[in-house]
Design a protein with these regions (language model features):
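Phosphate/diphosphate ligand-binding glycine-rich loop within oxidoreductases
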Residues: 1-34
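Short helix-loop-beta connector
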Residues: 29-36, 58, 120-121
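Glycine-rich Rossmann-fold phosphate-binding loop(s) that bind the pyrophosphate
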Residues: 41-43
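N-terminal Rossmann-fold NAD(P) dinucleotide-binding loop
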Residues: 46-47
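NAD(P)-binding Rossmann-fold cofactor-contacting core
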Residues: 55-82
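Rossmann-fold NAD(P) dinucleotide-binding segment
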Residues: 95, 99-102, 109-124
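Short glycine-/small-residue-rich Rossmann-like dinucleotide-binding loops
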Residues: 107-109, 129-130, 154
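Adenosine-phosphate binding glycine-rich loop
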Residues: 136-188
């Protein structure tokens, strides 16, 4: 037969699926009482990540950082208006990361944005932007210090993104007891 319909979503379904995966990870791995989040990035994925996160955590405080402060400010104004949340644009990543319960990175950064000094007990980080070999949002040294690293697919993260860079830097071993999200969800 003939084609009845064609869905041209321009990546929207992929973006929503990515945000849903972030929320599933946060539900499984972050503290249930998490109320504050740092969005590192101020694009479509950041907005979708927050929308999905709010379905699984009682978020009421949001900090936003973007390389372009004007973009973080405009994003924050729109987000506060549309959500009713307390949203603060931040000039630095340090300011955004101060005392938040969850951080979500969703940038195309080639250089680490989150470093060891941002880590503290109870912080959950959902890193979404490192989907290519050259991308890296979290420093290898920070990754070496986390209590738990969970990937959607270890076979992919060993060649792309943060784990790839930490392995290449020699700060974590290939058999460091990393888990996949599916294993965590299955109670393994």
């Amino acid at each position: 037969g003939l084609l009845d319909a064609l869905l041209l979503d321009n990546g929207y379904l992929t973006a929503v699926r990515t945000a849903a995966a972030g929320a599933v990870a946060a539900r499984a791995l972050s503290r249930a009482d998490s109320r504050s989040v740092a969005l590192i990035g101020a694009g479509e994925q950041a907005a979708l990540q927050l929308q999905a996160l709010r379905l699984v955590r009682p978020i009421d405080n949001v900090r936003v950082w973007a390389r372009d402060l004007a973009k973080a400010q405009a994003f924050s104004v729109d987000l506060a208006r549309d959500s009713g949340l307390d949203v603060m644009p931040c000039a630095t990543i340090d300011e955004a990361m101060a005392e938040v319960d969850i951080a979500i990175t969703c940038t195309p950064s080639r250089a680490p944005l989150i470093d060891s000094h941002h880590l503290r007990p109870g912080l959950h980080i959902t890193a979404m932007g490192s989907d290519a070999e050259h991308k890296n949002e979290i420093s290898p040294q920070a990754l070496a210090q986390v209590d738990r690293y969970v990937a959607d697919r270890l076979s992919q993260t060993r060649i792309l993104g943060e784990l790839h860079h930490a392995l290449a830097a020699g700060v974590v071993g290939d058999e460091s007891g990393f888990a996949e999200l599916g294993q965590v969800l299955a109670g393994q």
